Amino acid sequence: MLKLASSLRTGLISRSIRTLAPTVNPAEQQQVQAVLPDKLYSSVEIEYRGHDKAVLKSYTSFLQQVCQHLEIPQGRLEVLPYIRWVQPALRSKFVHKKYKLHYETRTHISKLEILNVTGSTASTFLEYIQRNIPEGVGMRVGFTELQPLPLTIQKN
């Protein structure tokens, strides 16, 4: 009985040792780094919207100063007309239809365009301005990427 138990124990230990993955010395591994060219963007369009016009104006001046300090070429600044949302509601729940309330929100929209930037510059710029975005302001970003012509079209 003891021989059976000891043989089971050694069998389990040897199986567990066999299933362990072989250790690899980090010095033996070859570190291969692929050098990829940085992306080029002809324009990065930043659209930001909010309900307070003064906050958007302040954030616009912040964006312009960031572009100036980081020496990023700035394109056009566009202030779009606001979007008005009106929801009529009855004052009381069931009666007196002539007594109504109007709930209204206005969403102000601004667009700023950044011209001729690399991918790393664009990502750093966007990370910085998104960390400093004020409360109640939403942002949408669009990229226009430059790509080389395919080999079938290129002139030799």
UniProtKB/Swiss-Prot annotation:
Similarity section: Belongs to the universal ribosomal protein uS10 family.
Highest rank taxon of the organism: Eukaryota
Matches recorded under PANTHER family: MITOCHONDRIAL 28S RIBOSOMAL PROTEIN S10, SMALL RIBOSOMAL SUBUNIT PROTEIN US10M
Keyword Protein biosynthesis in record: no
InterPro entries: Ribosomal_uS10_dom, Ribosomal_uS10_dom_sf, Ribosomal_uS10m
Annotated coiled-coil segments of the chain: none
Mutant phenotype after disruption: Induction of dauer formation and larval arrest. Reduced insulin/IGF signaling.
Subcellular location: Mitochondrion
UniProt GO cellular component terms: mitochondrial small ribosomal subunit; mitochondrion
Key words of the record: Mitochondrion, Ribonucleoprotein, Ribosomal protein
Mitochondrion keyword on record: yes
SMART domains linked to this entry: Ribosomal_S10
Principal localisation: mitochondrion
Protein name stated in the entry: Small ribosomal subunit protein uS10m
Function of the molecule: Ribosomal protein required for normal mitochondrial function and normal larval development. Thought to have a role in insulin/IGF signaling.
One matching Pfam family: Ribosomal_S10
